[in-house]
Amino acid sequence: RFQTIIHGDAKLANFCVNAREAQVAMVDYQYVGRGCGIQDVAYFLSSALSPDNCATREEEALSIYFTALEAAIMRHQPTLNATEVVEEWQRLYCWAWADFVRFLAGWAPHHYKIDRYSLQLTEDVLRLLEKREKQL
């Protein structure tokens, strides 16, 4: 329901960081488009954290992100209900990660990022799909 402009390839290699000035820029906009911002977040975390850290730091990383997102929405888009956006994107995180796994499975089926954490999130999504199918 809540969409934004997404980068589409938000891996760590596409970020330029000036730590001294606390500035960040992104490059390589070949996949830019409209979508759910949590897609970029999931892809960024997959490239910035090791597989083990994805599992152990997920809650912390997402908490930092969603706190900043909520503040940014309230400042720049005050007519939006920031809580609704955050709640929707929180629910969609596992879907975004499962989509990343789908991409990896087609591109590099033995990629090291197709690990226990990635497979667990994908299984969670598959269970949600089965549950929805039974409700139809």
Annotate each predicted stretch with a short phrase.
Residues Q3-I5, V24, C36:
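Hydrophobic "anchor" residues on beta-strands that sit immediately upstream
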Residues D9, D28:
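Conserved catalytic-loop position in the HRD/HxD motif
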Residues N18-Q23, R75-T83:
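Short, glycine- and charge-enriched coil/turn segments that flank and shape catalytic ligand pockets
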Residues Y31-H76, W97-D115:
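Active-site activation/catalytic loop segments of kinase-like enzymes and analogous catalytic loops
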Residues Q77-A96:
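All-alpha amphipathic helical-bundle segments outside canonical DNA-binding/catalytic cores
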Residues Q90-L136:
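ATP/Mg2+ or Mg2+-diphosphate-binding catalytic cores
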Residues A13, N18, V24, V32-R34:
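Activation segment
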Residues R1-H7, C16-A19, R127:
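ATP-dependent phospho-/nucleotidyl transfer catalytic cores
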